[in-house]
Amino acid sequence: MAKIVVGLSGGVDSAVSAYLLKKAGHNVIAVFMRNWDSSLNNDFLGKKNEKNFTICPQEQDWLDAKVVAKQLNIPIFRIDFIKEYWDEVFSDLILKYQSGLTPNPDILCNKNIKFKHFLDYAQKVHNADFIAMGHYAKTDNGNLYAGADSLKDQSYFLGQLSKSQLQKTIFPLGNLLKSEVRKIANELGLINAKKKDSTGICFIGERKFTDFLQNYIPAQPGNIIDISTKKVLGKHIGIMYFTIGQRKGFGLSGMKEPYFVVGHNLKEKILYVSPQSEKKWLESDSLMAKNANFLSENFRNLDNLSAKFRYRQEAIPIRIEKIQDNSFWISYQKYQAITPGQQVVIYHQNQVILAGEIALLFRNGKKLDYLD
């Protein structure tokens, strides 16, 4: 049987993953990753409910992971990737917010930390044959597939992994529903069987987003302007706090209908908005993506392709129009609020074949200037 290092987070998914691998007869080793230090990383503003904790949530996760490892009778170790996370995930996050983009830190977190540095560590220190994570996804010979639980499927976040990374990775929960995972944990009496799922920024956790970003990017107030009438409707606290399609949180009151964010002018610090009745400002029918990751050699010959532009979105039909170097162009029926900086992940049935970072959007052949 194989030697497998499991990323044990303190949550129920990784705990059940470790159990299933051990039950199958594998030599299982648990490793807890610590990738964020609030003191070192100047993380003071934006913490949620910190008065309710007698211990910081990350340290509680470590304690839970140790108890689970003891319950499963497997060894556990702890490794820090704090510098790597800052250099290869968080710095990019801040840079993109400063540029008016809406990044997804989970994409880089998976690519550079969980399935790069963690994999290297597992192979070099523990001589592991494979690593395993509690993601709801499937792998087969370097191919990536959506998980059986459509509500929990995390293949979207894994679209930038290489085939070599996927060949060394096991997802024990790929064929299970979340309810089945909870049931297994309850039957085993695991300490975290009823623990709430983790949310928020990868390895950082829940934060009050606006306050949290002010730790790293000074607030730069400016005008909120109706993109059609050019009328100033109010003031915003900083462009980086708002994403395309957002309809709450920018302080407009007394309006006849809801308004949406439809664009940014970084130089003039203008936040462009539009009323709900003018949805054309949010609509696109094609896009260009960069940083392409090709996970299938035969995708050019495939029909019935679909794409997701955000997590938990239902995939929509698309057509690949052009591929050039590390970029690709796709077309689709008009769709709203696709956001520069996010990932587009393309599927053939339930297999991920291609992913990239959304760079440009178009409507009727004309480029949409979401960012000036």
Swiss-Prot record:
Active site: C109, C202
A Pfam entry, by short name: tRNA_Me_trans_M
Segments of this protein annotated with the region Interaction with target base in tRNA: 104-106
Keyword Cytoplasm annotated: yes
GO cellular component labels: cytoplasm
SUPFAM superfamilies: Adenine nucleotide alpha hydrolases-like
Main location: cytoplasm
Site (Interaction with tRNA): H135, Q342
Keyword Nucleotide-binding among record annotations: yes
Record localization: Cytoplasm
InterPro entries xrefs: MnmA-like, MnmA-like_C, MnmA-like_central, MnmA-like_central_sf, Rossmann-like_a/b/a_fold
Binding positions (ATP): G7, L8, S9, G10, G11, V12, D13, S14, M33, G134
Region Interaction with tRNA: start-end pairs: 152-154, 310-311
GO MF assignments: ATP binding; tRNA binding; tRNA-uridine 2-sulfurtransferase activity
UniProt-listed Enzyme Commission number(s): 2.8.1.13
Family label: Belongs to the MnmA/TRMU family.
Name of this protein: tRNA-specific 2-thiouridylase MnmA
Species per Swiss-Prot/TrEMBL record: Mesomycoplasma hyopneumoniae (strain 7448)
UniProt gene name: mnmA
